[in-house]
Amino acid sequence: MKRITIIAALAGAGILAGGAALYFSSGTQEGAPRRALWLPAEAPTKPAWTARVTPLAGDGGNGVVDGALAASRFSDPFGVALDLQGNVYVADGGDSNRIRRVKPDGVVSTFAGGREGFADGVGAAAAFHTPSALALDRAGNLYVADTGNHAIRKVAPSGSVTTLAGDGQPGYQDGVGRAARFNGPVGLAVDRDGNVFVADTYNDRIRRIAPDGTVTTVAGNGQPGNADAPALAAGFDTPTAIAVDKKGTLFVADTGNDAVRRIEADGTVTTIARPLENDPQPILRRPSGLALTGDGYLYVASGAGGRIVQIAPDGALHALLDVDRPPEASYGSDGTVRLYAPRGIAVRRDGSLVVADTQALRLFSLAEPKKGEAAPPSQSPVIRHSASMPWPVGPQQEVHEVVGVMGEVRGSYDGESRHHFHAGLDIRADIGSRVLAVLPSKISDPFPNWGFGSLGEGMSLGPFSYIHMRVGREANGKALDERFQLLLDARAKPERVRVRRGARFAVGDALGTINPMAHVHMDYYPGGAVVNPLTLPFVGLRDTIPPTIQGIALYDAAGKRIRPARKGQPLRIERAQGDVNIVVDAYDQMDGNLARRRLGLYKLGYQVLHADGRPVAGFEAPLITQVYDRLPREREAVKLVYADSSGITVYGSKTTRFAYAVSNTMQGGQALPGSWKVGNLAPGDYILRIHAADFAGLVATEGRDLPVTVE
């Protein structure tokens, strides 16, 4: 094993820039000769550049598999660091609890750790608990924010792991080495003098570990807050990443405040970036990773929303663009890079980035596209869960009523009837009953829950989000157990719940209690993208009821409805109209549903037949236009696949109407406009047959045919 030790740097840059540099590699054994190595200059950073996102390591499945890049697996890839030989070090939490290494030759291996625990040692003899951020010093030592152990660990080039500070217990205490205490530290950085700066996440403070091991507090008053002020008077809310420049200025990803903060050498804290108020889709949301370039650019991983934000030295802020997702119409991509849950970022010498995505369970490379280079696959494979799945409410081994499925249109509380797609599965439960974990999982997101006291309150755990519950609280408001920390306001009233990264939950553990929505909503995102939860084999779930078609309507290209036919007569369409839009009013039900229940469909399309039932050429089988296995990430796409007569304006007992714009397409999570090309048909009588199917494969047979005459 070899590492590089810096002995010279041009222009005094903390990250080399501006010219070539001479380094020496350290030998694998004491006394071994060192080899001189010239490195090329760090490339100057391009403002607002366009990237190609390419999978670097991991296949999207959860596990611990070393070996070739594409076959490797991670459990919770979080922090990343690059050494001067091009090795990528990865802090892999979850059930892995390892420091992994990705070599330039394309092989993933384990560098240190291998079990959950708190133990020093060499290689696999060492133990970590949910390692998070990584940082390398100038001597090649790797520092680890060992979140679940409330400690900072040091890995020597030989693979020997020692504890730099912290004693394995949560708390707040300055001191030397193990006499100091942290509370779930997630972020860290090392300056050129060997000082280690720590984002002491759940203490809401920034700490410093001097080269002699002395721990002191740099900034933060110890309470979640949002205050620019000198040093210990400043307020942070769950800081999770930190970076330091060559002048000693610190930059902090202040996750709970959706902000990036700066700490000057004198301790003064200011805010350099945060979203505009009332911005419904900010590019900077829940920042959780930082990386500095040698020429002063700062990259920020927006943990919610998935964007990679570049902040220039002059303060200009841009989301990196994605060459393979150019801006589309109002219903499509905005053109920016959209990962799933980006965390750690590292900058290569050529200016490209390595990003760890905990939700996608992969490492990605972001680089300028090369001429003639093919675009990578746009989707991760869906890893099927084959074992029987318990329900998220009790009794977990008995069937419960499904009251909402993926892909349904949903309205907003302020009157918009087509506000967003329903992204998961709704399971009815009594208000106050407990929501239960369905898979053994650890908390990955440092800020995993949201919406305290609101109807949309929820928490992410493993590949799921559990929503519409009082997170971590009984119906009477008391905390369920010590994994949930109630934070109090100035009147000693609970104002939020804090759940640490690394908290572990077994199947059946209580996560919260049902709020007045009277159901729990589950989003499911194995490998990153939201997937239909009906792919999970829930115990006893049955569907023997085919969908119901309530009506079929046609609209011209201007959106005007074509006059319905008189009873017993075909609907007449002028061939000159060319493009016609098809809207189908339909719904589904499952076994056990109340009579009033309306569920959305899984697959829709249409077929054109001659009057005698023979398929028109090109329509030998139904043309499938919409499949609700994945959903677009752009919220406005809901207005493309649902007609404006869809939805409801408020939640509650009102019936939702699903008016599908069947001539528009929704495939593979991408929505595109379309139409029925009646201009391609010869004049005559036809049958427009709607294909409406549910996830079980049952197809509507009644009300599916609309006789038409093309004139």
Task: Give the positions of each predicted feature.
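Blade-level signature of beta-propeller repeat domains, shared across WD40, Kelch, NHL, RCC1
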Residues: 339-377
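Surface-exposed, glycine-biased beta-strand/turn segments
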Residues: 370-465, 472-477, 494, 498-510, ...
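Long, low-complexity serine/threonine/glycine- and acidic-rich segments characteristic of extracellular
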Residues: 500, 506, 542, 557-710
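Conserved beta-propeller blade signature
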Residues: 87-89, 141-143, 195-197, 249-251, ...
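Short loop/turn segments immediately following the C-termini of beta-strands
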Residues: 93-94, 147-148, 201-202, 255-256, ...
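Residue-level detector of Asp-centered blade-edge/turn motifs that repeat once per structural unit
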Residues: 82-85, 136-139, 190-193, 244-247, ...
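Gly/Pro-rich loop segments of beta-rich domains
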Residues: 42-78, 107-132, 160-184, 214-238, ...
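A short loop-to-beta-strand structural motif that recurs across blades of beta-propeller domains
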Residues: 97-101, 107, 150-154, 160, ...
